[in-house]
UniProtKB/Swiss-Prot annotation:
It comes from Drosophila melanogaster. This is Male-specific opa-containing protein. The keyword NAD does not apply. The gene is msopa. GO terms for biological process: defense response; sexual reproduction. Adult male abdomen.
Length: 83
């Protein structure tokens, strides 16, 4: 790592540590836990949806091309070069 990358990393860590941390005791209760259990009752059997039709049979897997998988190897587009 060069000096600029180390300096940026140091600044990011310092900013993350300097942020005030929230106290979990002061956070409000989640709404799902506050809801009464009767609200989550199951619908009656008459209102249930009909079962879905069966899925069509899966197609046979295709063989890989003779030259390999066809994908380029050793390519990383997520590299950022500084300097």
């Amino acid at each position: 790592m060069n000096f600029i990358q180390i300096a940026v990393l140091f600044v990011l860590v310092a900013v993350a540590l300097a942020r005030p941390q929230e106290d979990p005791a002061n956070l409000p209760a989640p709404e799902a836990a506050a809801a009464p259990p009767a609200a989550a009752a199951a619908p009656p059997a008459a209102a249930a949806a009909p079962p879905a039709p069966p899925a069509p049979p899966a197609a046979a897997p295709q063989a890989a091309p003779a030259g390999g998988s066809g994908r380029k190897k050793n390519v990383n587009h997520n590299v950022i070069t500084i300097g």
